[in-house]
Amino acid sequence: MALADRLLAAWYAGHPALALLRPLEALYRRVVTRKRARFLSGESASYRAPVPVIVVGNITIGGTGKTPMILWLIEHCRRQGLKVGVVSRGYGAEPPRLPWRVEAIQSAEQAGDEPLLIVQRTGVPLMIDPDRSRAVQALLASEPLDLILCDDGMQHYRLARDLELVLIDAARGLGNGRCLPAGPLREPAERLQEVDAVLFNGASADRPEGFAFHLQPSALVNLRTGERRALDFFPAGQRLHAVAGIGNPQRFFNTLLGLNWQPVPHPFADHAQFSAQSLAFSPSLPLVMTEKDAVKCRAFAADDWWYLAVEALPTPAFCGWFDSQLQRLLPGHRTP
């Protein structure tokens, strides 16, 4: 197990050695708290876009289902007749220049895996740049939009936001509740009291402190042909290789178990790069991976490689709340 994976496991399971990192945690907390205070006071300048900006992110290290939720938000806003754009850091991307407009035909190396997935799924205009405010300005200069979704960027205070949605893995919660490097928190837990909504991935019902949503498997999609198959394509008990290079691989493996398959788990680091050699497993079995990983593997995929398409399903209470926020942010807009 890599050092990063061991540290992640310790943050969520607890380990006495983490106490040694508390002096560094105290320093980290002071830095992030002062940074936020400077922007709130106006001491540090932030850019406010001429259209509403909704930040979708988390305060923890590790997967929370952010990309499926962004896909849901895009489609939901479109059903309201809104023109939506997305900005993202583009983690791991190596574009020719910044900001960079992501197109569906680009490679994951150039565009980043999550931005490419979003564009291939939705065709939404999407700009990547670690400087999210610059990405927003470039996106708005390229075409008229009603609304901007910021993929992650909770801690990027240079971009002013009108709504903050924070996602949390309901099973793992906030881990040991401590900030980096003694725990998984990017910001102190008190930050949750300031956001507009908290969504718990995998919660069985809404809570007083936030809304529930879950990820629903919808189909198997062949990497080479794009063919979609129902989830009963594999019989119960089917053994298969399971590949997940995401923030919480075990959630993906548990999903496959819940479909009554027998996955042989192959966890990789989040945003890992793949090759035919790194995925040449024995024995020979069908291979199922996440959609985020699939965008990096189509060029060398075998005939029996599939990805599991999933959809985010928030509760009716969240849908109603979110629609009320859209009406507040865009009072002149009429739903078709």
Curated annotation (Swiss-Prot):
GO MF term set: ATP binding; tetraacyldisaccharide 4'-kinase activity
Keyword Transmembrane helix attached: no
Keyword set includes Transmembrane helix: no
GO biological process, one term: lipid A biosynthetic process
Stated family: Belongs to the LpxK family.
Function field: Transfers the gamma-phosphate of ATP to the 4'-position of a tetraacyldisaccharide 1-phosphate intermediate (termed DS-1-P) to form tetraacyldisaccharide 1,4'-bis-phosphate (lipid IVA).
Record-given protein name: Tetraacyldisaccharide 4'-kinase
Gene: lpxK
